[in-house]
Every structure is written in structure tokens, then in C-alpha cells.
UniProtKB/Swiss-Prot annotation:
Gene Ontology, cellular component aspect: plasma membrane
Signal sequence coordinates: 1-17
Membrane topology classification: Lipid-anchor
Protein name: Alkane uptake protein B
Compartment annotation: Cell inner membrane
Lineage: Bacteria, Pseudomonadati, Pseudomonadota, Gammaproteobacteria, Pseudomonadales
Length: 1063
């Protein structure tokens, strides 16, 4: 038979295979009813826990929804799961929506405890395709990173693979090989000694794209000389030759020990698929949602992303053509699955979306001030999508539709820079399950698939897509559409990058970069992983970095040298050889940046000390809880302070959601070797006896530690038990030798200085010889939350090296290590710079005292500021209404923490006294449980509420009200007595001094995906300092923070990261 005649048979073969014809006949004989499709399919694994269950029948169901809810049973481990039922397509489909997300890593069964009634008096009993009666499916492991939740088995192994010799899905000469593992693969699997290779019969390695992410592995052979031809008809393995796929020494993320490594070898002999034919399949437009899926009732080919951070974003209408290569049907028996593939590099585009916070508050483009749009959304296939058209598994009826199974690895990105950075990523193992029918010469595919993108690196979202594809197969259509597919000839273009150029919006982005933060390049299309190793270079101070780590995720290339970037060193990123999937070479000019310096010629000699800026869960102060701890009632203790009474509130015992890691952020880069699980970092399970004694039930909770230069995360092996109590301890000592390598007794920074936990007691509370000052934090396990934990850092800061001092000979100097850089003038005064606060003496005492300089001289507008070092954790709750304005808003809760600041001098006219505060501490107070409560006895256990909303100018803003304590444990006074500077013994009231800040400011979204929140005060807090010198000299200094005198600047974490160490 000649080839062109073979092709001419394809439409007729498709008609027969898909249960239809140009004029589909109707069998007059009544047929029994049956189920013909389900999502998930019977036996499907790695199903999203947020999936709805869809059932499709041969005939319309006549039971009402209430009856169906009683007849249909959804179970897991013998427990029924509540759900609602919706009739779709006049009853031919049912959608079951679970009341709550399904548990991860669990098996579920759908059965009918009574037959369902269908049209014509038919009865439809419990369906079955494989295994036990009913539809059996298993949900995926959790993305939380905790071993018990992420793993689907105790050992690292293959959970399932496709193709597989023992399944209907056999290896073909155009197959792509996919593996789902029982545990997530370690991101550094290659540097840990792992390898993945495909070899031919002679042992030679076969060129292939290897993709690894989460628990998924894909090996996509490409044997054509040109990358653009990957997935074409020429890209096939040799039929009849034996190939071997080797997975060697692969490490698991949750247990990378040698004992848990995976090694496996798989041999296969690919089956011939030729002569193949390519069909052009078109994604049908839903007409603004008018056309809906017969399977689940959703708009056809429409993408809606469900999340807390962006609300319900969509629908975005998918458009475009896919070119599916089908195997030669006559070579396959009627009961065999007919293989197909869609070539690597295929693209589906979706229409632009408006970007909102929480689905309610408009995001603005930082550069233009216009409403932020995504621009065209693209989904690009990173490997050949491979699938099968199979006989219907639920019924033997020859008129039933065929089943479609399609596996894809895709990259998603957007046209506009900010949403591109927020969404760009690889989505591995996307699985479509659907049905295929031919009607009037048109092959029609209806399928359901789910994707779960990680938004902003903070939240796993979900989207269910109802695909509807059509391909004409009649005599007038193109017999083979291979030549209609346009090949990509456009090189990739850089859209944005982090930290960004010197003129980025805002211009301070390079000053916000810290060791541990990566460099991220965001392109407009995915890159070829094979081009990364030699296609990009990081130049440090004129020399190439030899230990550069690189990761590719979607269109984002993430770079970080081992040990992190360094302060005060010029860097340049050189791109020379990066290509897209088709081999087109990127052209990018060198990207230069530099982190702010933290020292000059070895100065300052005062290196400061590392502080715990945020502790999650908990409050970052050394706590006195021996006589106050009450675990049952959630009472912890008070921060130790230099005041004899430990001024301040009693802190609550924090609640910790079951699936979250302990996270601690530090002010300086750590000596990561000093963070030792079970020694300097301990996590215990505890209990409290009736007499108040604390008992340690587990000396060290099993888990893994993820270290970055200025942050650590501890993931417990098992979820925190609801109602169980825990304590974690960060070791700190002021004893000499505590930071000796190999003999650490403290967590230490890179300068060999131990963690300081007791700043509230002063810079030196024991002359360097007062033993341990461990930071101990107690918490209680609680249920997992659906809200989004969003950590923030306060950058940029003038005190770049975080030593709580400004390293300049003069505070107003602009030519020093940490130069003065404020808006304003010496004549008119200055506004605070980012993360600074301005203090003034009240006007009625201007002759008695002045901030920064002597009362009898010229004023000093540059010396009226303190500079803060801190971080902040937040919880994004979701849509609400601004209680002040009634406008749409998104509620955000703030976790209280403490801020460290530089010193401030206040000069008095009396005896020319200079009062120096020393480093100060601002403590955020927990909110009142009852906002209407007044007085000192009000219970304070609640997080601080805030709101993202719009102001009268249409700008996105954040507003909150924070109650604080001010502590100045090092406050001292120096007087001029007979012309001699003399220190005066001093008592004062700056211990737990309460005041309130009412804050508001813009929310700005960077083109690298990060969010910036500016906060300025619009009230005028009074701080009335009362001091007694020598026991007899009473002094009052009435200070104020003027309106707009506080400027706080928060930024969210980078959207991608490369941890420095995993343990």
C-alpha cells in the first residue's frame, strides 16, 4: 500500500475507533445504561486534593441531586467524605464537589450504594474499570515539605511510570518516559551523585531532555540534529532495538541518606508507530463562557486560578492549535491503546487577565501606574506530550467514546513582567483524562486536567481546565498537518531580573539584596536546560565564579554562588549561549549590580552581633517563663528586660499549623556550620505536669534543616500534632570559645560572634561572662490553615551591616560607609529614609532640649533619626471590607516581633547634658482579644489586623494600627561638670514605654515578583522621657514622632531561591 493511500485511510479508521461516523447511526435496540467516563479515572494516582469528581454516563441520570447525594458514596479509609452533587449536560454528567479539600496521600473510592436511575428506566450500578468495584484513586503527596505528608511510601522508589511493560501504555518509538516517585527528588540530586541516562543497545548515551521537579522525572529522547525538530516525525527511536533507562543513586529531599537512595534500570524495545499522521487540533473558544464542557459544566478551554493571594483570577480563554501525531491505527488491535504525541515546544496561549490582590484590590504597574494586566498567558510544552486513545474501560458498548489520556510537562509564563515573575514555573506531569468521539467528520476531545501553580513562591493555587479540542477528519481536510506547524525561530528575550538595574523601580533594589538572595533572570519563554551550564556566567570582581549554582524553573533562571553573594563586590551576569527549546540563542547585555558594602578597610571594628529578627512561631526575645508557663491555657511568659519587673506583656504560647516549618530570620549572615540540629538548634516535644514542671517527651523531634545565609527552616518529619506542645531552642552563650569551629556551643555569625537573644537587657548584661542566654520558644500544634504565610524583610536600611550603629564619623555625612541619604535639605529639614524614624523635642521645650545637637548652637536636621533593623511575618487571610471606608479589602494579620534601632542623642541645656539612648528596642504588642477592652488587664493573644485596600487616588495601600513598647536599656547621660564630661548615674522610664503608630502606605509590586509595602505614620506619638540623675536631678524630655516621621519599608521574599545547605 502506498503511503498516501495509507494516510487517506486515517479518517475512516478514526471514525471506527472513536465510536462514530460521518452519519452516526442509532442502535434502535435499547441499551443498558453505563458510566462511560470519570475524573479521576479508576486507578489514577497523584490526583490533586482540590479536585472535583466528574462522572459521565451513557444516558441522562433522572435522580434528583438530593437522591444522588444519598446513593453515591465517597470514602477514604472507611470514612465517608461529604460532598455536593450537580447535574451537568442535562444529567449525562455529575460533578461531585467535596465539602473540604481531600486529604493528601490517601486513597479514595466512589461507589453507588443503590443503582442510579437513568432515562428509559435504566439502572446504572457501581462502575469499575480496574481492581475492586468502584472508582479508586489516590491523591498526591503534600507540597508542604514534611516527610510524612510529602511521601507516599517510607522508601524512595517509583510509584508509577508511563510507559510501563505491565500496563496498557506500552513503550513506542516516539515515547517520552515519565516517572512518579514515592518521595520528592532532592533538588541537588546531581551534585549528590545521581544520574539519569538513556542508553542504546551498544551502551551509547541517547540525547534526551531530563526534567526533574518534585516527585516527577521525565526523560524525553530527541535524536534529531536540530533542537527545533524534537517531537517531529523524524524524532523516533529505532524500532526493535533494546534501550536501557538508568536512574542511578537518586537522592530524596525528605531523606537524602545513602540508605534511602534509588537506583533502577529499565529495558524496553520500542514498538513501531508508523506510518503516523499529524492532526491539527483547535482549542475551541467558549464565547465568553457561553459554551461549556459536557463533563463538568465549566467554560471550554478557560483557565481560572483559585488562590488566596489573587482570589479567583479568570477566566482566561485558551486559544491555538495543537498538532497531535497519531500512530498507525491498523497496526494496533481494537483492544489496544493507540499512542499519540504532541511535540515539545507546542504553545497554547490564553487571554490577558486583570491582576488583583485577593480578587478585590487592583494591582498597579509600578512603572506606569496603570492597572496591571498579565498580557498573553503562555503554556509551552517542555517535552513531547505523550498519550493514548484507549478503548472505554467502563463499558464494552462499541458506541461508547474512547478514553484519552495525555501526560504533559509544561512551562507557564505571562507577557507582562510582574505577573510573569509571579507565575513563571515548570508544571510537571500534568495529566489530562477525557473522551474522544467523531461527529460529522470532526474528532472531538473533551478532557479535564488540573494544574497547581505556586504563586509568588508562597501559595500553591489550583485550576481545573475543561479542554475541548476539535480536529477535522473528513475528506476535505488536510490529510497530514505536519507542515502546518510553525517552528519557533525567535530567540528568548529577557523580561526582568533580580535584583535589577540601577534604574529599576524602585531604584533601591540592589540595596535590598542580601547574601542568600539569588539572582533571577526572567525570560519570555522557557530555556533549554542543556544550555544553562555553559550559557551563563557570573563575574565577581572581574573573575568568573567557579562554584555557581543554577536552577531552571519555567522561564526563570535562578543563580547563586555557593556561600551566597558578597557585600561590596561588583558582580556581572554574562549570558552567552542560553537557548530556548528550539535552539534559538538569547542575546542579553551584561547585567551589573553590587550589594552595599558592610565594611571599609577592615572597619568598623564593631561587628555587632546576630539577632533573631523573626521567630516563627513565637516572639524573638529571651523569655522568663519559669513561674508563668501554662501550656493548657496558652500562657507563656515575659521578655527578660533590664527593668527589674520585666516591663511588658505576658506573651501567649503560639499556635503552629501542623504542616509548616519553624522559620527563623537573622540580622546577619550565619556561620552555617554552627547551626547543629540537636546541639545548638533543638526542637523538643514537651508536656507540663500539674505542678507546673515541664517534662521533655522527645529530646529532638525528627526532621530536616534547610539553611540559608540569614534564615533557617526546620521541617519536622511528621506534622505537628494538634494540641501537642513543643519547644525549640536556639543556643546562645557569651562564654569565650563558644564559636570555636568544631566546638560550637552557640549559633554564630560569619564573624564568629554568638547570637544575641537578650538585647532588651542591654548590649553587655554580664560582662561577657554570664553563661547561656538561650532563646527558648514554646508553641502548640494546631490544624493546618488555608491562609497564606508571607514573610517580609525591612530593606533597604542605612545600618547595612546591622551592628546597630551608623558607621560614619558624622551622622550627616554623605561620604562614608553608611552615608546619609534622605529627601530634603539642611534648610527645610529631611524626611526619614526607608526604615528610619524621626524624633523631635516638642516645640514648647525647644529651649530646654534638642535632638542631635546642643540647644545653644545651630540646628542639625541630619541627626534626628534612628535606623531600624527587623523583619516581619504576616498571614494573608483573604477578602473583606475595610472597616474605616467600606471599600473592598484583603485582610492581613501581622505577627508581633521586635525591632532593633540605632542610638539617638538628646542634648539638654542643663549642665550641657547629653542623653544617649544606646540601641533601642521597639516591641510590637499582641492585639487585644477584645478590641473594645480598656485598661492594663486586657487579654492580648491576637495577631495585629491590617488591610490591603485602595485610597482615594486609586492606589493600592496597606493600613494598620500597631501598639508598641519602647525600651532603651542602654540609656545614659553625660554632663559637663567643671568642663569635664562626667557620666551620671541614671534611672529612667524607657522600659516598656507604650505608644501607638497608625500606619498607612503604598503597596508596590516589582517586576521581579516581589511586593513592597511602605508604611508611614499619620498620628503623632508622644514619648515623654522621665529620668533622674544622681538620684536628685529630675529631667523630663518630651519627644514626638512627627506625622510622616516613621517610614517603614517591607519587601517579600524572592519568588525563587536556592538554599545554601540541606541537612
Amino acid at each position: 500500500m502506498k503511503y498516501n493511500k495509507t494516510l487517506a485511510l486515517i479518517p475512516a479508521i478514526l471514525l471506527a475507533a472513536c465510536g462514530g461516523g460521518d452519519k452516526q447511526s442509532i442502535d434502535e435496540k435499547p441499551r443498558p445504561g453505563s458510566m462511560v467516563y470519570s475524573f479521576p479515572m479508576d486507578g489514577q494516582a497523584d490526583v490533586s486534593p482540590k479536585a472535583d469528581i466528574v462522572l459521565r454516563f451513557s444516558h441522562a441520570i433522572t435522580d434528583d441531586e438530593a437522591t444522588l447525594q444519598n446513593k453515591i458514596i465517597l470514602q477514604s479509609s472507611g470514612q465517608s467524605q461529604p460532598f455536593t452533587v450537580t447535574l451537568i449536560d442535562s444529567g449525562k454528567s455529575l460533578k461531585l464537589e467535596p465539602a473540604n479539600p481531600l486529604a493528601t496521600g490517601e486513597e479514595f473510592t466512589v461507589t453507588f450504594q443503590e443503582p442510579l436511575a437513568a432515562e428509559g428506566g435504566r439502572q446504572i450500578t457501581t462502575p469499575n474499570a480496574t481492581g475492586d468495584d468502584g472508582i479508586q484513586f489516590a491523591t498526591r503527596g503534600a507540597y508542604a515539605g514534611l516527610a510524612e505528608l510529602a511521601n507516599t511510601a517510607d522508601t524512595f522508589d517509583i510509584a508509577w511510570q508511563v510507559p510501563a511493560s505491565d500496563s496498557p501504555f506500552q513503550a513506542m518509538n516516539f515515547s517520552t518516559f515519565r516517572f512518579a516517585m514515592t518521595q520528592p527528588v532532592h533538588p541537588e540530586w546531581q551534585s549528590l551523585g545521581g544520574s539519569i541516562q538513556l542508553r542504546d543497545a551498544s551502551g551509547q548515551e541517547v540525547p534526551a531532555t531530563v526534567l526533574v521537579k518534585g516527585n516527577r522525572i521525565t526523560v524525553d529522547p530527541c535524536v534529531t540534529p536540530e533542537p527545533s525538530q524534537c517531537g517531529s516525525k523524524q524524532d523516533i527511536l529505532n524500532t526493535g532495538e533494546t534501550y536501557t533507562l538508568q536512574l542511578t543513586n537518586l537522592a530524596s529531599l525528605t531523606d537524602s541518606s545513602e540508605e534511602n537512595r534509588f537506583t533502577g534500570e529499565f529495558t524496553f524495545t520500542p514498538r513501531d508507530t508508523g506510518p503516523t499522521v499529524v492532526l491539527q487540533q483547535t482549542a475551541v473558544d467558549s464565547g465568553n463562557g457561553e459554551l461549556t464542557s459536557v463533563l463538568n459544566g465549566q467554560a471550554l478551554n478557560a483557565v481560572t486560578l483559585n488562590s488566596v493571594l489573587q482570589g479567583e483570577a479568570g477566566p482566561s480563554q485558551q486559544t491555538g492549535d495543537l498538532f497531535a501525531e497519531l500512530a498507525y491505527a491498523p497496526a494496533f488491535d481494537a483492544d489496544e491503546a493507540l499512542p499519540l504525541r504532541i511535540p515539545k515546544g507546542s504553545v497554547l496561549k490564553s487571554t490577558s487577565l486583570n491582576v488583583l490582590v485577593g480578587g478585590k484590590v487592583q494591582v498597579l504597574d509600578a512603572a506606569t501606574g496603570e492597572d496591571q494586566q498579565t498580557g498573553t498567558i503562555k503554556v509551552t510544552m517542555l517535552s513531547d506530550a505523550s498519550g493514548y486513545m484507549s478503548p472505554n474501560q467502563y463499558t464494552d458498548d462499541i458506541n461508547a467514546p474512547r478514553h484519552i489520556t495525555l501526560f504533559m510537562d509544561v512551562s507557564m509564563n505571562t507577557e507582562a513582567a510582574q505577573p510573569n515573575a509571579a507565575l513563571s514555573q515548570d508544571l510537571m506531569g500534568v495529566e489530562l483524562r477525557g473522551i474522544a468521539l467523531v461527529r460529522d467528520g470532526v474528532l472531538t476531545i473533551d478532557a479535564i486536567g488540573m494544574v497547581e501553580p505556586n504563586l509568588l513562591g508562597q501559595e500553591f493555587t489550583d485550576s481545573t481546565i475543561a479542554f475541548h479540542l476539535q480536529a477535522a477528519t473528513d475528506a476535505d481536510s488536510v490529510l497530514d498537518a505536519e507542515n502546518l506547524r510553525e517552528l519557533d525561530a525567535t530567540p528568548p528575550s529577557l523580561v526582568s531580573w533580580m535584583p535589577g538595574p540601577a534604574n529599576a523601580v524602585p531604584a533601591t533594589r540592589q540595596s535590598m539584596q542580601r547574601p542568600g538572595d539569588p539572582i533571577i533572570l526572567f525570560f519570555d519563554e522557557p530555556l533549554d536546560p542543556a544550555s544553562v551550564e555553559n550559557g551563563v556566567e557570573l563575574i565577581e570582581n572581574g573573575a568568573p565564579v567557579t562554584n555557581l549554582q543554577a536552577r531552571l524553573d519555567g522561564t526563570a533562571l535562578v543563580l547563586n554562588p555557593q556561600g551566597g553573594l558578597k557585600h561590596g563586590v561588583p558582580y556581572s551576569v554574562s549570558v552567552d549561549g542560553l537557548t530556548d527549546l528550539a535552539g534559538n540563542r538569547a542575546m542579553v547585555s551584561p547585567l551589573s549590580f553590587e550589594l552595599d558594602s558592610i565594611e571599609e578597610n577592615g572597619s568598623p571594628g564593631n561587628k555587632g552581633f546576630p539577632l533573631a529578627l523573626t521567630t516563627y512561631p513565637g516572639y524573638p526575645c529571651e523569655t522568663d517563663y519559669e513561674n508563668t508557663l501554662d501550656l493548657e491555657n496558652g500562657v507563656f511568659g515575659k521578655c527578660w528586660t533590664a527593668d527589674a519587673n520585666n516591663a511588658g506583656d505576658v506573651l501567649p504560647v503560639s499556635k503552629m499549623p501542623a504542616d509548616r516549618p519553624i522559620t527563623v530570620v537573622f540580622s546577619k549572615s550565619l556561620d552555617l556550620d554552627s547551626v547543629i540540629v540537636g546541639e545548638t538548634f533543638t526542637v523538643q516535644e514537651i508536656a507540663q505536669e500539674a505542678n507546673g514542671t515541664v517534662t521533655v517527651l522527645n529530646q529532638q523531634v525528627a526532621g530536616r534543616l534547610e539553611k540559608n545565609n540569614q534564615r533557617i527552616r526546620f521541617y519536622p518529619e511528621q506534622p505537628w500534632q494538634v494540641g501537642a506542645h513543643y519547644r525549640y531552642i536556639l543556643a546562645s552563650s557569651e562564654q569565650s570559645g563558644t564559636c570555636t569551629p568544631g566546638q560550637y556551643t552557640s549559633i554564630c555569625d560569619e564573624d564568629g560572634i554568638p547570637l544575641k537573644t537578650d538585647l532588651l537587657e542591654g548590649l553587655n548584661d554580664g560582662d561577657g561572662n554570664n553563661g547561656p542566654d538561650n532563646l527558648e520558644i514554646v508553641f502548640t500544634g494546631s490544624e493546618a490553615r488555608s491562609t497564606v504565610f508571607t514573610p517580609l524583610r525591612n530593606l533597604p536600611i542605612r545600618d547595612t551591616n546591622s551592628n546597630l550603629a551608623i558607621d560614619c564619623d558624622d551622622l550627616g555625612s554623605e561620604s562614608c560607609l553608611e552615608p546619609f541619604n534622605h529627601q530634603g535639605s539642611d534648610s527645610e529639614g529631611f524626611l526619614p529614609s526607608a526604615n528610619a524614624a524621626k524624633l523631635l523635642v516638642t516645640q514648647d521645650h525647644a529651649e530646654d532640649a534638642r535632638v542631635g545637637c546642643a540647644v545653644d548652637g545651630a540646628d542639625c536636621p541630619r541627626k534626628k533619626f534612628i535606623y531600624q533593623t527587623y523583619a516581619l511575618n504576616t498571614e494573608v487571610i483573604g477578602p473583606t471590607v475595610d472597616p474605616d471606608t467600606g471599600r473592598d479589602a484583603v485582610k492581613v494579620l501581622l505577627y508581633p516581633t521586635q525591632l532593633a534601632t540605632t542610638s539617638l542623642d538628646v542634648h539638654l541645656s542643663l549642665l550641657s547634658t547629653v542623653s544617649s539612648t544606646g540601641p533601642q528596642v521597639l516591641r510590637m504588642r499582641y492585639a487585644k482579644d477584645d478590641p473594645e477592652c480598656t485598661g492594663a488587664s486586657c487579654a492580648r493573644n491576637s495577631l495585629i489586623p491590617g488591610y490591603i485596600t485602595e485610597n482615594d487616588q486609586g492606589e493600592t495601600i496597606f493600613k494598620t494600627k500597631a501598639e508598641l513598647f519602647l525600651d532603651a536599656p542602654g540609656l545614659k547621660a553625660t554632663a559637663s561638670i567643671l568642663g569635664i564630661p562626667t557620666d551620671l548615674p541614671l534611672t529612667h522610664n524607657l522600659f516598656g514605654y507604650p505608644f501607638t503608630l497608625e500606619l498607612e502606605g503604598r503597596v508596590v509590586f516589582f517586576d521581579d515578583g516581589r511586593m513592597q509595602i511602605e508604611q508611614r505614620n499619620f498620628n503623632v506619638p508622644h514619648i515623654d522621657v522621665e529620668a533622674v540623675a544622681l538620684g536628685i536631678i529630675n529631667t523630663e524630655i518630651p519627644l514626638i514622632i512627627p506625622e510622616q516621621g516613621v517610614y517603614l519599608n517591607f519587601i517579600s521574599n524572592p519568588v525563587k531561591e536556592i538554599p545554601a545547605q540541606y541537612e
